[in-house]
């Protein structure tokens, strides 16, 4: 099994920062590679021949410079730095069609930005469904004065994996009628899973030991994390899944949740943790179990009927005498027990000393999430508009006043839902497509109510983890059924709501968030499930338009569509 030694990682980090001072710089070549993520050969999108991509390790205040070389033969690429607010550098956010053009094959684009706040983050492709192809890695920003006390740490990057290519998946989702891509074949921890092995890569369903086909040095073999007894370890967890909602447990150990999406939270103890796509956590694990044993870290599916085996990693005490854990891994909680999931979400509060939200908001959006049809194509819509991101990036269109590049009519801020039954399929299944924006003045307080509803057929409402670019927001609360304006606001938590950049919208319910428009730019706000975003489930926020018009934006970020023509006519190359 692959072994990670925490103290070695720490030495590397210290040496890196000693040599690099306040600049973390690297050149990344993105290309397809043959790989065995789940013991079955497939094609991954690798960085410098590595899958998952290299970990960025920086200190708050550092400048990160990444030169991305596109070595893909026939497609563009961008990279989004998930959780980094990009204050003053919206062009470096890495959202194709929103903040930049795709990097063409053979070309290089340089991302340069400051990591202004410590936390556990990650990066991933944000063009088409490239995240699902393995274009992702961890991004750790350390605090010069860490408030947590622990002896070592490990990164756990969680993902899901299909044997079908992303191009086939995109075609299936865009077909008429839509062809659903199905559940992932495997779950991965740090790029490793076991598709052709029995449960736990060691046990069959009856609990009897079984033999797997992989060897100890295979790319799919479970990693081993070596620990010493009676120590405290920080597990940095990030979910970059394309579809799956997950649950993580460590056999024989409890977890203390201390960080969520790069923000400290009031510590609380759990036996396992739900992790939705786009979320990150830090948990503290005390190694107080029998040191002669080995223990499983297991990751299973939540929120969808599980048809995918667990992903596994091994906790190995240095004095352990076992060759492998002698017991089956923890059983993932029942997939459709949403009350259990909601109970976990409602335990998350801001740590002491964190800023409280403003008492009142200046504006409110109520975003109704529905599944609809557009000319018989299945789409996801927000307030009856399925987002169609234009070829010309919004940031360039707004910076240079190119008003023909996107729809000037903004989507509805609220739909009249008095007679809309969220518990049933939509009475009118048809929707529209659009590229309009929500335009906010600089420095105002905005509330967003995410409202879930039934899908096109049956009695089903899906989980949607929503992620915002360029911001953190306060999670004010969750509710059942249809949001009641003027009434449900009274239930908002204004005392100690957590700051997040990703929040879950539960089936047949609503979620309320609040943020301040203090970061001039164009920011994506979307469901973090790849198929849902591909099918139109997102909106675009623009704030501080007058300030965007004064920004110095690199021409290379905007060299496509109408901005390309505008820049050429200005006499620039």
Curated annotation (Swiss-Prot):
Binds 4 Cu cations per monomer. Its EC number is 1.10.3.3. Residues 1-21 form the signal peptide. Cu cation 3 binds at residues 126, 469, 526. Keywords: Copper, Disulfide bond, Glycoprotein, Metal-binding, Oxidoreductase, Plant defense, Repeat, Secreted, Signal. It is found in: Secreted. One of its GO terms (biological process) is response to hydrogen peroxide. Glycans are attached at residues 196, 336, 384, 430. Cu cation 4 binds at residues 464, 527, 532, 537. Coiled coil: none annotated. Its main location: secreted. SUPFAM superfamilies: Cupredoxins (SSF49503). Cu cation 1 binds at residues 80, 467. Dimer. This is L-ascorbate oxidase. It comes from Arabidopsis thaliana. The lineage of its organism: Eukaryota, Viridiplantae, Streptophyta, Embryophyta, Tracheophyta. The gene is AAO.
């Amino acid at each position: 099994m692959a072994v990670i030694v925490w103290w070695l990682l720490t030495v590397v980090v210290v040496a890196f920062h000693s040599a690099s001072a306040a600049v973390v710089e690297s050149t990344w070549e993105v290309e397809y590679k043959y790989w065995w993520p789940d013991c079955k050969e497939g094609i991954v999108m690798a960085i410098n021949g590595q899958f998952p991509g290299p970990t960025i390790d920086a200190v708050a205040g550092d400048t990160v410079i990444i030169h991305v070389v596109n070595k893909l033969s026939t497609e563009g690429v961008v990279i989004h730095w998930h959780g980094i607010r990009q204050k003053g550098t919206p062009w470096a956010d890495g959202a194709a069609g929103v903040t930049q053009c795709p990097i063409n094959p053979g070309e290089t684009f340089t991302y340069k930005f400051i990591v202004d706040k410590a936390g556990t983050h990650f990066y991933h492709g944000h063009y088409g469904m490239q995240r699902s192809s393995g274009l992702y890695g961890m991004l750790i920003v350390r605090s010069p004065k860490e408030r947590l006390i622990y002896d070592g740490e490990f990164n756990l990057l969680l993902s899901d994996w299909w044997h079908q290519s992303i191009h086939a998946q995109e075609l299936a989702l865009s077909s008429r009628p839509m062809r659903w891509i199905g559940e992932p074949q495997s779950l991965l921890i740090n790029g490793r899973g076991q598709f052709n092995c029995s449960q736990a890569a060691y046990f069959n369903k009856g609990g009897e030991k079984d033999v797997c086909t992989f060897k100890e040095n295979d790319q799919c073999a479970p990693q081993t994390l070596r620990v010493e007894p009676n120590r405290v370890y920080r597990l940095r967890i990030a979910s970059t899944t394309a579809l799956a909602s997950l649950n993580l447990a460590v056999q024989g150990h409890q977890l203390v949740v201390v960080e969520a999406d790069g923000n400290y939270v009031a510590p609380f103890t759990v036996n396992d943790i739900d992790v939705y796509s786009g979320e990150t956590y830090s948990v503290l694990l005390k190694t107080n179990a029998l040191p002669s044993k080995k223990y499983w870290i297991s990751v299973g599916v939540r929120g969808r009927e599980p048809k995918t085996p667990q992903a596994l990693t091994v906790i190995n005490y240095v004095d352990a005498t076992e060759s492998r854990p002698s017991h089956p891994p923890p059983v993932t909680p029942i997939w459709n027990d949403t009350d259990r999931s909601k109970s976990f979400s409602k335990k998350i509060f801001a740590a002491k000393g964190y800023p409280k939200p403003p008492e009142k908001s200046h504006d409110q959006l109520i975003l109704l999430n529905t599944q609809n049809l557009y000319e018989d194509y299945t789409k996801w819509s927000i307030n009856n508009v399925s987002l169609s991101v234009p070829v010309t990036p919004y940031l360039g269109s707004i910076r240079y006043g190119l008003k023909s590049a996107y729809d000037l009519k903004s989507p509805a801020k609220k739909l009249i839902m008095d007679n809309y039954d969220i518990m049933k399929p939509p009475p009118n299944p048809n929707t529209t497509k659009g590229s309009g924006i929500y335009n906010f003045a600089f420095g105002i307080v905005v509330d967003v109510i995410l409202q879930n509803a039934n899908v096109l057929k049956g009695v089903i409402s899906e989980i949607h983890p929503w992620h915002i670019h360029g911001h953190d927001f306060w999670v004010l609360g969750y509710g059942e059924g249809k949001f009641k304006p003027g009434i449900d606001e009274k239930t908002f938590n204004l005392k100690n709501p957590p700051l997040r950049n990703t929040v879950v919208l539960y089936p047949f319910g609503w979620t309320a968030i609040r943020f301040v428009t203090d970061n001039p730019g164009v920011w994506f706000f979307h469901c973090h499930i790849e198929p849902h975003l591909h099918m139109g489930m997102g909106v675009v926020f623009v704030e501080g338009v007058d300030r965007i018009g004064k920004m110095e934006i690199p021409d290379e970020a905007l060299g496509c569509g109408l901005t390309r023509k505008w820049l050429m006519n200005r006499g620039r190359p």
